Amino acid sequence: MRILSYGIVILSLLVFSFIEFGVHARPVVLVLSNDDLNSGGDDNGVGESSDFDEFGESEPKSEEELDPGSWRSIFEPDDSTVQAASPQYYSGLKKILSAASEGNFRLMEEAVDEIEAASSAGDPHAQSIMGFVYGIGMMREKSKSKSFLHHNFAAAGGNMQSKMALAFTYLRQDMHDKAVQLYAELAETAVNSFLISKDSPVVEPTRIHSGTEENKGALRKSRGEEDEDFQILEYQAQKGNANAMYKIGLFYYFGLRGLRRDHTKALHWFLKAVDKGEPRSMELLGEIYARGAGVERNYTKALEWLTLAAKEGLYSAFNGIGYLYVKGYGVDKKNYTKAREYFEKAVDNEDPSGHYNLGVLYLKGIGVNRDVRQATKYFFVAANAGQPKAFYQLAKMFHTGVGLKKNLEMATSFYKLVAERGPWSSLSRWALEAYLKGDVGKALILYSRMAEMGYEVAQSNAAWILDKYGERSMCMGVSGFCTDKERHERAHSLWWRASEQGNEHAALLIGDAYYYGRGTERDFVRAAEAYMHAKSQSNAQAMFNLGYMHEHGQGLPFDLHLAKRYYDESLQSDAAARLPVTLALASLWLRRNYADTVLVRVVDSLPEVYPKVETWIENVVFEEGNATILTLFVCLITILYLRERQRRQVVVVADPVAADVAQPLDADVAQHLAAFPR
């Protein structure tokens, strides 16, 4: 690449293989203002509404009830899995995944035909897949209208993944009144999945790339039992290390580090850790017995373990004890006063869940005088600590105008955060597992599905796979494997969506796409706009590119002063940019002092000449952006030559023997020489 591609397309400022600029992912941060907190609506509008009932009695729901048409039965089949309700759908889905893995275009054709037949017969889950197929242009001509129509039918039939896709579509169009309704339903399902079921709300989205390079550090930690660090930890645990036992128990309980959740193994390691005197395991044992995770549910044992943990100074255990008292589980009877006291103890020790549960008491008026504003403050503290249920309650408040000023945009954003933790988020884990096994095609399909549902990490992962692996990505187009045009267009669309959700590196890639005309018409003005957006997020490479465009008058006014300013800002933002910035400043010096000369015209022509001689240096220069590097390198050599020649002229003038024949040094030349230390 010429501008941006000095680095590897996403994060680095220069793409030559040995230089990378700093990489920083920018998370989306949602902030509540004082106006929101102080100007709330009707504080008395909640009453005893079940909408805000955290402590109500609810029946556990199965995976199929929470996520109809779930893909789990394909990736994690068990004896309880039932596919009889949609045999044609599951058959077609299996074939789609197999075709993506094998790169088998004929099988993919057969699979989509089978799915289409099921869709025409009214299967909502097959209709959801057809919405996906039309959305990306796989085996069918890309059609936003047909995709939208199929997702509507699927959502009406109860498919949650299509509801996610529709909600994100409405969100992108700022149709918050429609988006908020769907996200509210999805968030409620997500909350049910980790409040009622035995699964915990822990999500580990993994960005498989760091810039244009593979994120080797994160991927290494996601290899599960094959990870060398895990094997060392397991060895230490087997030798009696209590801390190692506790950590392994955590990994299995929450399904961390690429491990599948295994509550039985978690229970085994927590019990061994407790035997060795490890107190943190006591609290988790209390939670395990309260949830019935891997054991028969036993609230009496849960209370015993939580009480022991609290005595050991694990103050978050107070929150669990308070919950048992408010529900009347494992104790003589419900006792709201004791529940409040335990929640307050947890709050005094800054436990997020304690803040959340105390907020629920004030919201409902359970054991305390009802105070919605006080509840809001507790929810706010819990949300700042990342408590997903607190985001859910705040979303409801913004949605209904209870306790907070009604704000559908904020409600939608908060609901979305919670909805993305629903059972359908398992697609991310299966995609990562496929990628780690080298099954890039299956990973691409899974990430693309999640991208459609609005997951920013999945959008950038899918786009990166398309860019990084090219033909090896197993990308399927309308009538075969994706052409370069189809692949670039798909990647461009994905980067664009990720950019809209705050991914600064995606904005950088959008600028690249417009600058080089990849996946879209070449447009320097829109490229500059995208780079400006990335620059506003302190992206060094975007600053460099803006300097380059000012220097050459591409999409921005020709302005050498602004060019230098952006080059300098790039270096200030990232010290790794020193070499490219030095080369760029060398080019700028030539342009200032030798404008409209043959020398500058030759330098400017190098990017066009470069492809003709590329075969001569293909073992040295691999990226199109290196044409710019070659150009700047020539500039540097030229400047060094000119400076040396000028230095010799100065020496001649200073020589007393030659003084009588020496000509006075041009003032401009002297000024420029003074600017360069010798």
Swiss-Prot record:
Assigned protein family: Belongs to the sel-1 family.
Keyword presence, Iron-sulfur: no
Gene3D superfamilies reported for this sequence: Tetratricopeptide repeat domain
Chain residue ranges for the region called Disordered: 40-71
SMART domains linked: SEL1
UniProt-listed GO biological process terms: ERAD pathway; hyperosmotic salinity response
Main location: endoplasmic reticulum
Residues carrying a glycan: 298, 335
Signal peptide: 1-25
Gene, per the UniProt record: HRD3A
The entry's keywords: Endoplasmic reticulum, Glycoprotein, Membrane, Repeat, Signal, Transmembrane, Transmembrane helix
Subcellular location: Endoplasmic reticulum membrane
Origin species: Arabidopsis thaliana
Role description: Component of the endoplasmic reticulum (ER) quality control system called ER-associated degradation (ERAD) and involved in ubiquitin-dependent degradation of misfolded endoplasmic reticulum proteins. Functions as an ERAD substrate-recruiting factor that recognizes misfolded proteins for the HRD1 E3 ubiquitin ligase complex. Targets the misfolded LRR receptor kinase BRI1.
Topology of this chain in the membrane: Single-pass membrane protein
Pfam families in the record: Sel1
Keyword Heme: no
Subunit annotation: Interacts with OS9.
Domain of life: Eukaryota
Cellular compartments per GO CC: endoplasmic reticulum; endoplasmic reticulum membrane
Sel1-like repeats: 124-159, 242-277, 279-313, 317-349, 353-386, 388-422, 506-537, 540-568
Protein name per UniProt: ERAD-associated E3 ubiquitin-protein ligase component HRD3A
Residues that span the membrane, as ranges: 620-640
